[in-house]
Amino acid sequence: MKTYRIRKDDKVMVIAGKDKGKVGKILKILPKRNAVLVEKVNQVKRHTKANPYAKTPGGIIEKEAPLDISNVALLCEGCAKPAKVGYKYTADGKKVRFCKKCNHEIA
């Protein structure tokens, strides 16, 4: 299975596409599609049919569509810019991510 340098609940910035420059939180990672769902980014409208058994109303709803993972970059809290991510070990032996620009640890 492929590993990624970004995780669920990370703050990311879109670096390519129609929503370039927008910032949001990762809601879900889709490894089979090599994509991510980012909160309030890449919104699409879907027409849904009412389902009386599930008590869901019909109509037009807006939801997030997947973005390719190469179009997002992790946002560093230290320098507030998209970051290239590296890994290092702390003094107690814990592996952590860090921003290669400002050397700030990313939780």
From Swiss-Prot:
Belongs to the universal ribosomal protein uL24 family. One of two assembly initiator proteins, it binds directly to the 5'-end of the 23S rRNA, where it nucleates assembly of the 50S subunit. One of the proteins that surrounds the polypeptide exit tunnel on the outside of the subunit. CDD domains: KOW_RPL26. It comes from the Bacteria. One of its GO terms (cellular component) is ribonucleoprotein complex. This is Large ribosomal subunit protein uL24. The keyword rRNA-binding applies. InterPro entries: KOW, Rib_uL2_dom2, Ribosomal_uL24, Ribosomal_uL24_CS, Ribosomal_uL24_KOW, Translation_prot_SH3-like_sf. Part of the 50S ribosomal subunit. The keyword Ribosomal protein applies. GO terms for molecular function: rRNA binding; structural constituent of ribosome. Signal peptide: none annotated. GO terms for biological process: translation. SMART domains: KOW. Keywords: Ribonucleoprotein, Ribosomal protein, RNA-binding, rRNA-binding.
